[in-house]
């Protein structure tokens, strides 16, 4: 992570690259990255009531004990008043009592992040709000003015699901696998003109061929243990699942769900007998 909380990776201590580019390089699209690491919820604008309709989700109340006004979409009754203290347990009780769809104000969307790209005009630079865009009054107004009434929002909060990877995706200029692999090639071989075929071959040779990369059986066992993976210790190259698990672990570390390994602990080092 850097000071802006973007997630990066490095190869051979060279220039850092967005972690989202690594995920694209192994075949993920930006949509698939968002789906892998974040749940999402749909919001639809009700023009008659001037409110946004969505499913009631108790998870949204883990990070706060107060709330904006919430209206039962079915009955029209106010179930949570503005400023009421609502705990996660209280929210779960609302759900168990039958609260399903709710209406919320536009302000309740402020600070949330788009789970899918939204195109509001043909302007390639200003007319597209990418995955991870943080919503505010101006952006929501532009979306509605473009006659877009339904959007998908990533579920994030300040307690256990930060928007770090969403921010990384938003700032990543690469859009697909070829873009990502080409950038990685340029970092590894600066000054050499890249072609897609050569860049792909170099990237695959880095980690995914046994002739060039070997975790060793000990490395595989340690990786399986640290990342809770089930993989034969005979597989000593990196797999896509390993990279995905590493990114999940990095997000967990940033969210305080895990602890960083102690580099000085011998359990985290390869110890060989001498003599």
Tell where the protein language model's regions lie, with residue ranges:
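N-terminal non-catalytic structural scaffold regions of very large proteins
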Residues: 1-275
């Amino acid at each position: 992570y850097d000071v802006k909380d973007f997630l990066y990776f490095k190869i051979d201590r060279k220039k850092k690259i967005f972690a989202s580019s690594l995920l694209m390089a192994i075949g993920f699209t930006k949509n698939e990255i968002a789906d892998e690491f974040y749940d999402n919820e749909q919001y639809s604008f009700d023009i008659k009531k001037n409110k946004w309709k969505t499913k009631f989700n108790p998870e949204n109340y883990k990070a706060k004990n107060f709330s904006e006004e919430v209206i039962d979409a079915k009955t029209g009754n106010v179930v949570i008043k503005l400023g009421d203290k609502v705990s996660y347990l209280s929210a779960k009780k609302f759900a168990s009592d039958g609260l399903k769809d709710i209406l919320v104000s536009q302000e309740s969307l402020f600070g949330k992040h788009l789970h899918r790209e939204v195109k509001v005009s043909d302007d390639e630079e200003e007319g597209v709000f990418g995955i991870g865009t943080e919503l505010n009054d101006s952006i929501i107004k532009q979306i509605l003015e473009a006659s877009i009434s339904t959007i998908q929002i990533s579920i994030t909060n300040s307690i256990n699901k930060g928007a770090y990877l969403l921010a990384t995706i938003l700032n990543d200029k690469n859009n697909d696998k070829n873009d990502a692999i080409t950038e990685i090639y340029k970092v590894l071989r600066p000054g050499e003109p890249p072609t897609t075929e050569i860049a792909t071959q170099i990237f695959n040779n880095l980690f995914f061929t046994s002739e060039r990369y070997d975790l060793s059986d000990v490395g595989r066992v340690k990786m399986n243990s640290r990342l809770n993976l089930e993989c034969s210790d005979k597989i000593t190259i990196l797999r896509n699942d390993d990279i995905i698990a590493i990114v999940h672990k990095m997000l967990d570390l940033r969210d305080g769900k895990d602890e960083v390994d102690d580099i000085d602990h011998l359990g985290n080092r390869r110890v060989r007998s001498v003599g």
